[in-house]
Amino acid sequence: MAKKSAIETNERRRKLSQSKAAKRASLKAIVNDKTLPIEERFAATLKLAQMPRNSAKIRVRNRCEVTGRPRAFYRKLKMSRVALRELGSQGLVPGLVKSSW
């Protein structure tokens, strides 16, 4: 089980990145638009730099929904391999059966 503080920090980052995503995308579009004057692009760069670091999507870490484990994460299932194995052996994951041949 991951530390509660790490899970909460990640959730705060996720919420902040979702709320600031539109503003960040518009500023990035201005910065990358080569047809605009350099002063306007530089001003957008400064505004982008003044935004909170945790509002960047890259700061969000994929974590297991069950245990909070940050590694060995399956995106499709939103859980780690350890949790998947435990729940699968209990028969709680639909369609997952223990292999036998």
Curated annotation (Swiss-Prot):
<dbReference type="GO" id="GO:0019843">
    <property type="term" value="F:rRNA binding"/>
</dbReference>
<dbReference type="GO" id="GO:0006412">
    <property type="term" value="P:translation"/>
</dbReference>
<comment type="function">
    <text>Binds 16S rRNA, required for the assembly of 30S particles and may also be responsible for determining the conformation of the 16S rRNA at the A site.</text>
</comment>
<comment type="similarity">
    <text>Belongs to the universal ribosomal protein uS14 family.</text>
</comment>
<keyword id="KW-0689">Ribosomal protein</keyword>
<dbReference type="GO" id="GO:0015935">
    <property type="term" value="C:small ribosomal subunit"/>
</dbReference>
<feature type="compositionally biased region" description="Basic residues">
    <location>
        <begin position="12"/>
        <end position="24"/>
    </location>
</feature>
<dbReference type="GO" id="GO:0003735">
    <property type="term" value="F:structural constituent of ribosome"/>
</dbReference>
<feature type="compositionally biased region" description="Basic and acidic residues">
    <location>
        <begin position="1"/>
        <end position="11"/>
    </location>
</feature>
<keyword id="KW-0699">rRNA-binding</keyword>
<comment type="subunit">
    <text>Part of the 30S ribosomal subunit. Contacts proteins S3 and S10.</text>
</comment>
<protein>
    <recommendedName>
        <fullName>Small ribosomal subunit protein uS14</fullName>
    </recommendedName>
</protein>
<dbReference type="GO" id="GO:0005737">
    <property type="term" value="C:cytoplasm"/>
</dbReference>
<dbReference type="InterPro" id="IPR023036">
    <property type="entry name" value="Ribosomal_uS14_bac/plastid"/>
</dbReference>
<feature type="region of interest" description="Disordered">
    <location>
        <begin position="1"/>
        <end position="24"/>
    </location>
</feature>
<keyword id="KW-0694">RNA-binding</keyword>
<dbReference type="InterPro" id="IPR018271">
    <property type="entry name" value="Ribosomal_uS14_CS"/>
</dbReference>
<keyword id="KW-0687">Ribonucleoprotein</keyword>
<dbReference type="Pfam" id="PF00253">
    <property type="entry name" value="Ribosomal_S14"/>
</dbReference>
<dbReference type="InterPro" id="IPR001209">
    <property type="entry name" value="Ribosomal_uS14"/>
</dbReference>
